[in-house]
Design a protein with these regions (language model features):
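Canonical P-loop GTPase G-domain recognition
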Residues: 128-137, 142-214
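Short interface patches used for recognition in eukaryotic signaling and trafficking proteins
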Residues: 4-7, 81-88, 109, 140-145, ...
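Amphipathic alpha-helical interface elements that mediate macromolecular binding in regulatory proteins
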Residues: 17-20, 71-74, 91-98, 102-105, ...
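Short coil/turn segments at secondary-structure boundaries
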Residues: 11-13, 34-37, 84-89, 112-113, ...
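Eukaryotic intrinsically disordered and solvent-exposed regulatory patches
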Residues: 6-9, 56-61, 88, 92-97, ...
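Conserved nucleotide-binding/hydrolysis micro-motifs of P-loop NTPases
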Residues: 26-29, 78-80, 114-116, 143-146, ...
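Conserved G1/Walker A P-loop phosphate-binding module
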Residues: 1-82
């Protein structure tokens, strides 16, 4: 998108428990979940069955962006770990992952290379993607923040962990890069050519999706 979207929150730990549908619009606007689920022009009316506990944690963010003319994104909450998983949700997180996965054309699993963590909640969420293996792409983000040797170890550990959860005969496609508009960190600068190619490959994959696809 090459820009932030309205209501975006970024941090080293999960900074939101909201599902955010990021869609194209002439002006920047955030629509609360209750209103979005009542709008017949949007594909979210079926979300009413998850109740107000979820709808209060769902919103539609609109902004002008060329890529959003063809697809829209659903940004899911950062996964929780430990005790936070048990008390931190007012809705069925895994059931919602399954609902969105059924309707999505592409599913991106994001991992940070400098902080690889597959919590129990993330593992259960991945298990809910069973039957959608062809839609899944893995993104190893912030790969420029680790050395070549560390990157190899992180990649191996990630694929080993995913192999225990994703029961697919096909090899998952993994994109290794740093997916924001900042310069690469010095420690990973030697992989610039690789990171550039991987970033372009991911964008090409998204652009190949049918018009009005969901990610």
């Amino acid at each position: 998108m090459e820009r932030d979207f309205p209501g975006q929150r970024i941090g080293p730990e999960p900074t939101t428990d909201r599902f955010v549908a990021v869609m194209n619009g002439k002006a920047e606007k955030v629509t609360p979940g209750n209103a979005a689920a009542m709008d017949s022009s949007r594909p979210f009316r079926a979300l009413n069955r998850f109740g107000s506990g979820f709808l209060s944690k769902f919103e539609v963010s609109q902004c002008p962006s060329p890529i959003l003319k063809d697809i829209y994104f659903v940004d899911t909450p950062g996964v929780l770990s430990g005790e936070k998983q048990r008390i931190g949700r007012s809705y069925d997180f895994a059931a919602l992952i399954e609902w969105f996965a059924t309707r999505a054309d592409r599913i991106l699993l994001l991992f940070d290379a400098h902080k690889l963590d597959i919590s129990d909640e993330f593992r259960r969420s991945i298990e809910m993607l069973k039957g959608h293996d062809d839609k899944i792409r893995v993104v190893l983000n912030k790969s420029d923040r680790v050395s070549n040797q560390q990157l190899m170890r992180v990649y191996g550990a990630m694929m080993w962990s995913l192999g225990k959860v994703v029961r697919s005969p096909e090899v998952l496609r993994v994109y290794i890069s740093s997916f924001w508009d900042k310069p690469y960190a010095d420690v990973g600068a030697s992989n610039k050519d690789l990171f550039d190619k991987e970033r372009n490959d991911l964008l090409a994959d998204l652009r190949s999706l049918p018009r009005n696809s969901a990610v």
